[in-house]
Amino acid sequence: MPQRIVIGMTGATGQIYGIRALQLLRETEYEVHLILSDAGKINVSQEADYEVSEVSELADVVHDVKNIGAETASGSFRTEGMLIAPCSMKTLSNIAHGSSGDLITRSADVALKERRPLVLMPREKPFNRIHLKNMLEVTDAGAIVFPPFPSFYQGPTDLDDMITRTTARALSQLSVDVEVDEWEGLSSSHSP
């Protein structure tokens, strides 16, 4: 049986994180299932230098967000987990409150009920109290909230490097091993 990862892409800004996850997963043996929301499709065209068809080609299987009867809607369909990148506040709220109105939220609900990793990359700033409460709710339910904040201690060379490192860290929460440099501690020139 193949090892499967589900990628959900919602209408929040930051489509490059979902695209980069798909690109990184192409270098692995995982079977990748993509669910792209209608608003996500608009934002892919708006903010990324990709056509929706190009993004879809990065996945092994593409599911219609309205098809709540797709394989990923059932716990009997085994996956290694799910990453929602980017995750809109609407999607986060729906997951937090058990509202499974589309295939992304239903697949997330399945991940939680089956105790599979669910990683959410929320894209909003600043967070309001409702956002934070919803993040706490999904965390209490077993999800991992992973805002795409870049790290600087490894000396990223450019924005693309920051996106890759951040996305690779998110995928590592699903136990996906992708090739990026690991932190090796402070160099002797930076030690106190």
Question: Model regions: which residues?
Answer:
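A cross-family phosphate/adenosyl-ligand binding-site feature
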Residues: 1-119, 123-192
